[in-house]
């Protein structure tokens, strides 16, 4: 039987400024355990806003977000941070690495101290699968954009969260590495029953997903 792990109910989000932008309009979507889903759409369609709302990094103006059946909308900043640490791995489009830490230190940072000691071999194997083991002791400024992106991906996967949310995870990679990342995410979804939601502008990467969701003008126009 399918199990809901992530849900948005009628969420809306408007960005106000000189020009008011309605990024999401009464959007509802359910993600089940072990799914690998791709969200596609043109730039400015609302796909990254939806991902940030699902990750509790952005607050919808209306509607509700549920994680593992728990209503998280309206919780305090500290409560949301706790939920993210336990249940969500997030892959940022702009890497979001700490410049004062090495690649390895960036990856283990979200992991509990005791688990870091026990899981060094596992983390090194993960880095090897992403072809960044040689970056273990390098700082972000010493790595290419593609290497930094793969460190960001390793950090999200290392915490073994139930949900992985990825904002353009292959955007800074060449075709071969992009395919490797998409395949790795797909396998992680299958082997560990992780729910993976990937925002991408690349139709070829979306083909790796079990389900494709298209966002157009802040609304879901395709969900299959």
Give the ranges of each region predicted by the language model.
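H-loop (His-switch) and adjacent beta-strand-loop-beta switch element
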Residues: 212-224
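ABC family nucleotide-binding domain
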Residues: 5-6, 11-27, 31-208, 212
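Short, Lys/Arg-enriched, disordered terminal segments
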Residues: 1-4, 224
């Amino acid at each position: 039987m399918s199990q809901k792990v992530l849900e948005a109910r009628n969420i809306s989000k408007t960005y106000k400024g000189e020009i008011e932008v309605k990024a999401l309009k009464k959007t509802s979507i359910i993600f089940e355990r072990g799914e690998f889903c791709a969200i596609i759409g043109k730039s400015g369609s609302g796909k990254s806003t939806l991902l940030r709302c699902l990750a509790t990094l952005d607050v919808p103006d209306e509607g509700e977000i549920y994680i593992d059946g728990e209503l998280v909308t309206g919780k305090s900043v500290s409560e949301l941070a706790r939920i993210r640490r336990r249940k969500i791995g997030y892959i940022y489009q702009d890497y979001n690495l700490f410049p004062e830490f090495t690649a390895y230190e960036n990856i283990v940072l979200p992991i509990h101290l005791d688990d870091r000691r026990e899981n060094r071999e596992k983390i090194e194997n993960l880095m090897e699968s992403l072809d960044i083991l040689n970056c273990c002791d390098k700082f972000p400024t010493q790595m290419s954009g593609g290497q930094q992106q793969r460190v960001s991906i390793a950090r999200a996967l290392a915490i073994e969260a139930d949900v992985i949310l990825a904002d353009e995870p292959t955007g800074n990679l060449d075709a071969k590495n992009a395919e490797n990342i998409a395949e790795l995410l797909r396998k992680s979804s299958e082997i560990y029953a992780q729910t993976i939601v990937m925002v991408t502008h690349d139709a070829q990467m979306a083909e790796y997903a079990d389900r494709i969701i298209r966002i157009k003008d802040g609304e879901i126009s395709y969900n299959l």
